[in-house]
């Protein structure tokens, strides 16, 4: 796993015990999963808008910035749920070399 992801994961774990007034991440943890999911939704919308703007302007700087926010808040969500980013990387690795259609067909139906 990337050193950056490891460092972020460690900081997110460390913030679980921090005072909510001293850390943005600690304040999210303190407010609970619903607040984290709300932020994740906001960042998703901002990323989509930035991508549409980038397609028109050719400037991807905002989409990179917003994607970083989206990934970050996804990592906060995973940490809140007791999951490490490595679990997502393992899932991506499992899918590597598997066609998207085959992967989708292998999922249990809802």
Swiss-Prot record:
Presence of the UniProt keyword Hydrolase in the record: yes
Annotated metabolic or biological route of this protein: Amino-acid biosynthesis; L-histidine biosynthesis; L-histidine from 5-phospho-alpha-D-ribose 1-diphosphate: step 2/9
Signal peptide location: none
Disulfide bonds, paired cysteine numbers: none
GO-annotated molecular function: ATP binding; phosphoribosyl-ATP diphosphatase activity
InterPro entries for this protein: HisE, PRib-ATP_PPHydrolase-like
GO BP term, example: L-histidine biosynthetic process
Pfam families, A to Z: PRA-PH (PF01503)
GO terms under cellular component: cytoplasm
Superkingdom of origin: Bacteria
Subcellular localization: Cytoplasm
Main location as per UniProt: cytoplasm
Family: Belongs to the PRA-PH family.
Protein name: Phosphoribosyl-ATP pyrophosphatase
